[in-house]
C-alpha cells in the first residue's frame, strides 16, 4: 500500500496570514503545491487542505487530515516578527514528528536557507499548536522565511524559489518515509523572459505606475504572463 501525506497550506481567502514583503497565504500555496507535485511523482498519495486561494481554518485542516488518515502531515507557513531563517515545530512527545522536522530542516539548509532549529511549544493542553496537537499522525509545521525581513523574504521572493522550498519539504518527507529520490540539490532555474513579454511588462508597469514587487506578484500567478500581455495591448 502506498504511503499517504496530508499537506496544509496555511491561511487563505480572507485570512492573508503575515503580510509585508510577501503575502504569506500566496507563498504558502506555491510551496505546498510544489511539495505535493514532488511527492506524487514519487508514488505518494497526497491530500491538500486547499489547492487555491480559499478559506482554510485550522480546525477544518485538522478534521480533513484525520479523515484522510495519512502517514505524515505538514502545515506550510511563513513567519513574521523580524526574525531570520527556517524553523519547524513538532510534538513535545518527539518520535517520528521530530525525525520529520529534522529531515525537512536538512533539506531546507541545502537550498541555501539558514535554520533557527526544530522546536516544540508547550501549551495548556499539551502541544500549543492545534495542527501538531490534534492530528492523529506525526505532524510538523514548517515556517519557511520571515516575510517582514527583507533579506529573509528574498529567499522566497519568486515562484521558483518558493517551489524550491516545497521540493525541500517533500524530500524531507520522503527521507522520513524511506523513499528514494533524485539527490540533486540544484535550485530550479529562473525562467527566461522573452523580448515580447518583457516589453509588455515594461508597458504595463509604466502605464499603471506599479512597483517591481507588485509586477512580480502578478506574474507569479498561473495566468499572470497572459494577463500582462492583454493589458499591454489594452493600453496601446
Walk through the language-model features, giving the residues of each.
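Extreme N-terminus of proteins, especially the signal/transit-peptide cleavage junction
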Residues: 1-3, 194
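Catalytic-core environment of secreted peptidases
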Residues: 3-20, 74
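Active-site-proximal helix/loop segments of hydrolytic enzymes
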Residues: 3-4, 26-188
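Glycine- and acidic-residue-enriched helix-capping/strand-helix junction motifs
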Residues: 16-30
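Short, flexible active-site loop motifs that bind/organize anionic cofactors or intermediates
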Residues: 18, 51, 152, 205, ...
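Short, solvent-exposed alpha-helical surface patches in non-cytosolic proteins
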Residues: 188-236
Amino acid at each position: 500500500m502506498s504511503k499517504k501525506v496530508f499537506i496544509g497550506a496555511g491561511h487563505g481567502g480572507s485570512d492573508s496570514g503575515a503580510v509585508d514583503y510577501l503575502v504569506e497565504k500566496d507563498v504558502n500555496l506555491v510551496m505546498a503545491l510544489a511539495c505535493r507535485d514532488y511527492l506524487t511523482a514519487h508514488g505518494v498519495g497526497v491530500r491538500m487542505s486547499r489547492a487555491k486561494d480559499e478559506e482554510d481554518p485550522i480546525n477544518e485542516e485538522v478534521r480533513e487530515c484525520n479523515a484522510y488518515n495519512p502517514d505524515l502531515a505538514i502545515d506550510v507557513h511563513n513567519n513574521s516578527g523580524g526574525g531570520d531563517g527556517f524553523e519547524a515545530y513538532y510534538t513535545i512527545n518527539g518520535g517520528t514528528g521530530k525525525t520529520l522536522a529534522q529531515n525537512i530542516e536538512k533539506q531546507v539548509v541545502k537550498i541555501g536557507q539558514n535554520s533557527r532549529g526544530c522546536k516544540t511549544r508547550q501549551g495548556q493542553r499539551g502541544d500549543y499548536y492545534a495542527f501538531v496537537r490534534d492530528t492523529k499522525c506525526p505532524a510538523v509545521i514548517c515556517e519557511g522565511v520571515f516575510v517582514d525581513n527583507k533579506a529573509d523574504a528574498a529567499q522566497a521572493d519568486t515562484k521558483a524559489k518558493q517551489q524550491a522550498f516545497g521540493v525541500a519539504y517533500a524530500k524531507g518527507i520522503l527521507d522520513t518515509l524511506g523513499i528514494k529520490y533524485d539527490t540533486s540539490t540544484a535550485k530550479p532555474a529562473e525562467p527566461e523572459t522573452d523580448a515580447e513579454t518583457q516589453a509588455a511588462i515594461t508597458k504595463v508597469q509604466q502605464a499603471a505606475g506599479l512597483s517591481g514587487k507588485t509586477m512580480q506578484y502578478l506574474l507569479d500567478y498561473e495566468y499572470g504572463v497572459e494577463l500582462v500581455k492583454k493589458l499591454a495591448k489594452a493600453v496601446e
